[in-house]
Amino acid sequence: MGNINSICLNNNGKYRIDSISCSLEGCKLNSKELVENMVALVDKYPLTQLLIIRECKLKQIPVNITNLSNLSELILSDNKLSQLPWSLPPPFKPNTLLSMASITNENLVRLDLSNNRFTEFPSSVFVLPNLKQLILCNNQLTNMNVTLCGGTSNNNGAHQPHIACQLEELKLSNNNFTIFPSIIGDQLTTLKSLDLSGNTITSLPNSFSNLVSLTSLNLKSNKFTCFPPSLCTLDKLVHLNLSCNQILVSPSDHTLGVSLLPSLEKLELQHNRFAHFPMDILEIVSLRVLKLQDNDIDKIPDKIGNLLNLNELFLSENKITQLPSTIGELINLRKLYLEYNKIGSLPQEFSKLSKLNILILHNNDLKFVPDQLHSLSQLLRLSLDENQLSSSDQKLIKSEGSLALIKRKNKLNYGSTMNGTGTTSSSGSASTSTHGSINKTTDILLSSVTLNNSILNQINNNNNNNNNNNNNNNNNNNSSNNNSGTNSLSSTPNGTGKSKKKLTHLTISRSLFRGNSSNLESEKEDFINKKQQQQQQQQQQQQQQQQQQQQQQQQQQQQQQQQQQLGSTASPSTASPITSHITVNSTVLDFEDDIQKMQLGLEALSNLETSIGSNNSGGGDSMNGSGGNINNSGGSGSGCGTISGSTTKQRRGSVFLPPTNAFKLSPNVVSSSYNTLPASVMSGLLQQQNLENGGVGSGSGSGSPIISANSICNSNSSSSNSLLKPPIINTTNLSTSPNLLSQSSTSFLNLPPLNQSSTNSFLPPQHQHHHHHSNLSQSLSINNLAHRLPTSLSSSSLSSNNTYDSLQFQQQQQHHHHNHNNHQNSNQPLATIVPSFSKFKNSFDQLLEEQDFSKKKRETLQKLSKEQKWNLLLQYRNSTLNMLNMKEHSNNSNNNQSIKNSTIIASTTTTTTTNGESLDGSSIQQQITKNSNFQSSRFYIDNLTSKTDISLVKEVHDFLKESGPEVSIFIGMGGIESLLGILQFNLDNAQLQFDEEKVGYCLLCLKILVECTAKSVITTNNSLNLVTMFLTSASKYIIDIIIDIYDELLRLQVIGVSVVLDSLINFQKVKGLSSPYVPLVALLRNPIIEMPTKTTVFKIINFLIYSFSVLEERFSVICSLLKVGILEVIGMFRALPHTSYSLRFELDLFEEVLDSDESELVKKIGRKEVLKRMSNEDNDLSKQSSKQSMDFVRVVMVSAGYGDLKIDLDERTSYANVIDFIQSNYQIKYSIDRYGLFVPAIGSLVLDGSILQSSGSQSRWVDPSKSLIDNGLSNEIVEFKMKPMQIQVLQSVVVVVATNHQKEDIIKEFTIDPQLKCFEIVQYLRTRLDSSSPAFQRKISVLTEDEDEDYESDIYGVYCFSSLESYDQGSWYPLNSRFLDFNPTNTPTIIDVKLMERPLRVLFSGTEKLMKFNPYVPVSELIKEIKNEIHLKINIEDYGISYVPNVSSSNLSSLIIEETWLDPTKTLLDHNDMKCSVVQFKFKPRTVSVMVLVESGIEIPTTDTPYQFVNTNSISEIIEKICTPHQLNPLSHSLYISDCQGQKIKLLSRQNCLRDQQVNNGDHLIITSKQKDLPSDFNVWDEPNDSSETITYSKDRRVSSVTLNKLIEKLTSPEYTQDSEMKTIFLSSYRSIITPSVLLSKLMERHTIPTLVDKERGKLIQRKTRLLIKSWLELETTKNREEVITLLVQNMPAQSIEDDGLKELTELFVDLSTKSYSSILPIVIGELPKCKIPKIIDSYVTFADMDEIEIARQLSLLTFPLYSRIETSELLNQRWSKPGGGPNIMSVVGLFNKISNWVSFTIVNQPKLRDRAVVYGKMVKIANAFYELRNYHLLMAIISGLNASPVLRLKYTKGKLSKNLKDNLDTLEELMSTQSSMKNYRADLAAASPPAIPFMGFHLSDLVFIDEGNQQLCDSRINFKKLEMYKKTIATLQNFSLFPYQFTPVPIIQNYFLDYKIVADKPIYEMSLSAEPRNAERYDIQ
């Protein structure tokens, strides 16, 4: 392939070769060379399967192409072919049988000959035996006369050619056919797809009906005038295109003639002449897509509602004025295009189109926004432009888009508030609405999904306030929103106030006890460590109990065996191992069948029955029939509940191994329910996080709820690697930046185990690193619940071998934040950011093609302006256009990996990147060309087929990740459809040709597209349904990708939920499952799925639940999940030894909504009815008709963590039988004696004030002494739950003994439900304890209307201790945990209800931190704790704690609220008005004592008594206090800091206070006369207002002169608009007037804001000051910058916690002093110019041997480093003329003198005239080379050497020069002429582009003139015009110093000049005289 490589280097084109494919495009070789290289290509790669030669002007194909025996696809489009190499030589006998193998490519399947020059049909293609697809579009064919293929003659003597192939697809579009080719209907009967568009055919022959296999027919743009009747016989036709013809509708019956097309799904009839809607179309009920645009239809018939399957309807460019009401019956319609009609309104029924995604209504006659649009909750694209709407509506549409207009009207249900009652029906009808029926639940899934906007707002507010909710961690434990049965937040319509909240039980994990351990691991450890002895006793007791239970089980088993031997009547398959009196009804196992189906996957369905039978034996509804134990192939790990013995068949195709960066292009911020969590849940979650991190109940007295590395439990299960190891969090970073908590995220690299189960996805060791998007990032922060993206995210340090380094992690976070913002703002129009037309031209052309506008309309649209075209494009593709504004990027380091399985032979595109920064410090945006490794979008679209090689699919994956704007074009061209086509092919051929790797990469591509533009994927037909079908895959990686896609989709409000539910329901129907949630639960139980993926699955489940706003609908979904075994899965996850925080979070969230909804529904319909819904009663009723009726009892065990159990009763079934059965078949954590059977009451719940009595008089506990029938339980439902327990409570009361009040401790007993949480116990006991108890030490406040909940309840807790003597050794129970979790064995303990540590949000230095304080200690101790927490060296006496008292909103208008300081001597409890306040730890004003001295001459008596001033008083106030008593004018005096002798040290600024100027107790001040103050002493803030004394302007209003202080003021003023230019001028030349230290001191003065200045304005000034400092460093040159950095380090600001900007200034100083600066910008170019190395003889080179151009290059390389090192300070005040003042300038000047001297010496050193002339000419050539390189400095050096007197006098030598050289020299001399101040040089330099080197001598002269011709000061003001002139000259020099020359150094040439020693002028002149003596004649010269 050497020739191919040479092609690549010398000609434009793209080449791509791998093991089986070769692509050559756009080659410019001549025909002969091209054919020769093709011959070489065929010989070199004989195994090629795909050969592409496109756009190469190929005229013939080499004959040896037939040697490619494996060739299956040959693409020769866009060439000049007219014949093929397979022609058979005539004559050819008809009956001769030939073997074609020797002359054809017998394996060729696809042949593309489009866009060539065929005038006759290439008959030879029919000799290709396996040809399936033939493309001959855009040729010049007029017929298909096939005569050269042999064949036979028919009865009529007509020749019938022999056709060896069986074509399936034939494309003949855009040829010259006038008659339909008869051979198609006669012999090509195997065709499935036929394209004859763009011809002039008028009719179809009768033989056309022979094409019985035809599924797609395209007859677009022909001359049909009626519907071809022969089409009606095509039963398999799916797609028919008859657009752009002249077909008419029958005027009588308005019919077209369409009939008998039962399979037709897509019908295209646009651009015809329909005056009426074709009525017979409405009978084709299979239609999914109907296109009728650009006709003359004015009315849509009512029967349009018949098309129930219609998905897309195109009716644009008609004359429609109204739509029929029946259009609302098109319930599956997703896309509706109605633009360019005359529609004035929409029918009411239009609102029924609930699935509508795209609605285009622009250019109609709408006069108002239709109300019907408000109900279309799934709209993704809406266009209402160019209607007759109000001007305000039109303005909003233009600026924000049509969807934004709908949202603004607050009617679209994108986030409607929940029903305040929690249900849409009365309690009477509630029981029938969601009666546990799975089918009924499925029916309402899509119609009832709404999101609660108030919840979303609440969460957003929580996140905006960072950790604000942390203060309410305990508040919300027992206080939430309980409005008539809903568990969500209610909001007032206008948002003006909050409705009053009532106390409720809702909080995180507030669930009935499920038999699971508490998830608060860190709290339990603290508690267990304090009670170690007690636990040991408990363990001993448990062991004894277990032994007793084992003995009982053995006895019961023996009894059962004996009874079975006696002839028990129970069925062997359902008999209990305990007793035969219990028969388990099999209906409870119905849903297990569905789970088993899902676990087995696609290949194991044949083994379904045996697998289910083996697992269901033994009774019970546990996951494996053995009591719910986890069977995980030898150990506990990632899976739950496997099916023993199931095997899978090995699939064909490769195994999918995802790339390491396949999962989550950027890691997500994980939350469990996206944007829909209730506020009460949110607050509970915040507390849960706090508890997890050891923040509550630790008894430490203080601490912050930050994440500690020690508080996160690593997963280290030995049996599985699927459990994630959470990251180690850098607590230092978190503690110093609390905002990090709300911004943290992480990513994980999993090491999946080598798969030993039934899957073919074996991972070799080198592929075990699997980058997963784990939800454990949730462990970092709950505050990210409302924003899963990623936004800008900060990464914590990750100490795991499986994580990326922090730099890569941050880049991924920033990238995912961008993807997330795409989702958030996808509806925002981009009209305000119109890119160049070249960027969106392709998209615009695609739009015109897609929408298929009429020719006239296209011409009109093409004439639109750029802005109008962009606006039109926005109407259709607003979800992808944001990509057009993205910068294309290329990662050079990854270029070699972009196409992993391909070798890039060549890419002739040279990428040049130029980085630069403007002089004002703003960086120029980097411009980088597209990654040349990728092909165009069109290439991928054309080649993405079911036969596509996996390498191309991988390349598409990389292309979508890295190609930016090209992705939009890829989508517009049908890229999504191409990917779905590959998936559909693999799904249809799963048993034969399933390619797992290809499927995996296609899904990865879709995942990328979902992240970038989810709406485009959603609006693609059947996309998500198809993706969901792969949930049965045996590859865990494919499952992971699908779950990631779900996760991403659910970020879209409303539509995301609907799409996911829709796909699950479709999956349910296709697979015949009983519930749409079966796939999700099956994944949770699948052992091959890893825990991070299972966590995401559970997160999806939670979000689906929370998306239902109506209580009963939500509970119906929960019940559906209960029936498919979700509780068993939860129990198994809880039992795992190491469970991630994020998974526990999801489990808690599910239990939260289950419990809260259950409790609310119990209040409405009664507990018995609720239990019925939670059970499988409906399934039993459906089967009772076929079974003999008998008594039964249904036992609901939800509270124990299981489902329900239906037991058939007989007279012998006893209470003990049931309990024993449960104990034997289920894992009940606690002693079975603590449980009982409870019979709930009938009817709604009526509370009597006790939280223990949960039902009316009919509720009761089952009597254990009676049989179940005697207990009246026949056909009843009972609940298996824990019995009440007794607790001891300490109550301290005050008694009177002999008139003395004494405290006495009393212990009382109370009965409580052990499943209660501690905060509920607090609530309960506070209503029953004596009022003198510590629980009442603080009064319960009365809620005001604007308060969210009762704040007091959160600060009371349960303090546990064993006896009064050991009271101090007790522990706090976490409020959110169950009492039973910390007292599992009911050990006798005493509890005390008292105030807990109080959490406060402390604000200091702009940072907010949650801390906890003992409410009983003085505030002074709190101040010390805060100081220790912030780790700053501050004077504690200067600081205090302040807060703003809470005031009711009704009083805000009449009160002026002032902050209050906490009294250090009091406790927190003494400050009743600081409830819910954020306290501030800040500087507290105090009095300082100073001595004031008086300067002589001032009539103020001296005194030894110190003055007392408040340190917040300004100096002007203090001067006034001193002068006023003595009748002195304060404005005439100043105040200095002095020493004790009165020596002035520093002038105090009049505007700043004592504290700002570090005046402390004992300091000395001296008051002086202001007249003696020097200008340099004035503070910037003391500068007077603008006047002629401080600033003057020129006529053009430019600054002419200005004082230093005024200049600093202007540069940092928020109002000043000319600061950018002034800043550059000043910073470039400030060293001419002041030193860097003076400038820094002035800037720090300006940054210190006086107290009296407005705070917001002060922050703006500080910000501009910091920006000025940053620009200062950026504009400094290297050495000067080092000097300034040293000053920054020496003047680092002092520590402060005030929000005074010092923290930001310190961070800036640190950043600037550690930042790396680059003075020269790198230039990325192609290959460097080839250097010309001279001949070297004995290590010596002569001048004659050196090339002139190479000399110029090497001298330029020597000059530029010297030139680029010139410092700014060297150019000011003629510093270079002073000794040592300008070393770099002198180096450049010295090189100039050396070269000039060398020129003169080299010329005169030649003894002969001829040699001198040659050298002279060579010097001219060098000078010209310097000019070409824009090295003006050395160009002038050459000219200077040539014009030196020793050379100038050599007239004979110069006379020997050629005319060209003389002219060249004259031109150069004219360019560098000094006349008119070097006008020519100035102009040429101004037009030059870098790299270049100016002539330094000229610019130094300019600087001398500037310095000497302009004074420095004008009346003590800076001459700013002089600085401006300085800047102009310096900028010219510095601009070219950034871009170096790019040549290869040649050391021997450089050393030649470096070693040259300057020769004195006198010897050179003598040599000149010797060469040409004075007055010598020509003949005297040698």
UniProtKB/Swiss-Prot annotation:
Q: Compositional bias (Low complexity) at which positions?
A: 415-436, 457-495
Any one annotated GO CC term: plasma membrane
| Cross-referenced SMART domains | Drf_GBD, LRR_BAC, LRR_TYP, RasGEF, RasGEFN
Disordered, as annotated region: 414-436, 457-532, 615-654, 756-778, 807-829
Q: Does the keyword Membrane apply?
A: yes
Transmembrane feature ranges = 1832-1848
Gene Ontology biological process terms from the UniProt entry: actin cytoskeleton organization; Ras protein signal transduction; sorocarp development
Q: In what residue span(s) does the Ras-GEF domain sit?
A: 1747-1974
Q: What is the lineage of its organism?
A: Eukaryota, Amoebozoa, Evosea, Eumycetozoa, Dictyostelia
Q: Which UniProt keywords apply?
A: Coiled coil, Guanine-nucleotide releasing factor, Leucine-rich repeat, Membrane, Repeat, Transmembrane, Transmembrane helix
Its recorded name reads: Ras guanine nucleotide exchange factor V
Topology, Cytoplasmic side: 1849-1982
- Per its database record, what is this protein's job? Promotes the exchange of Ras-bound GDP by GTP.
What topology in the membrane does the UniProt record assign?
Single-pass type I membrane protein
Coarse class of the primary localization is: membrane
Q: Where is the composition biased (Polar residues)?
A: 506-520
Give the subcellular location.
Membrane
Coiled-coil residue windows: 515-567
UniProt LRR repeat ranges: 1-26, 47-68, 69-94, 105-128, 130-151, 164-187, 188-210, 212-234, 236-257, 261-284, 286-307, 308-330, 331-352, 354-376, 378-399, 443-466, 592-615, 657-684, 773-796, 979-1003, 1075-1100, 1239-1263, 1689-1712, 1865-1888, 1917-1941
Q: Which PANTHER family match?
A: GUANINE NUCLEOTIDE EXCHANGE FACTOR (PTHR23113), RAS GUANINE NUCLEOTIDE EXCHANGE FACTOR V (PTHR23113:SF184)
Give the Extracellular compartment stretches of this protein: 1-1831
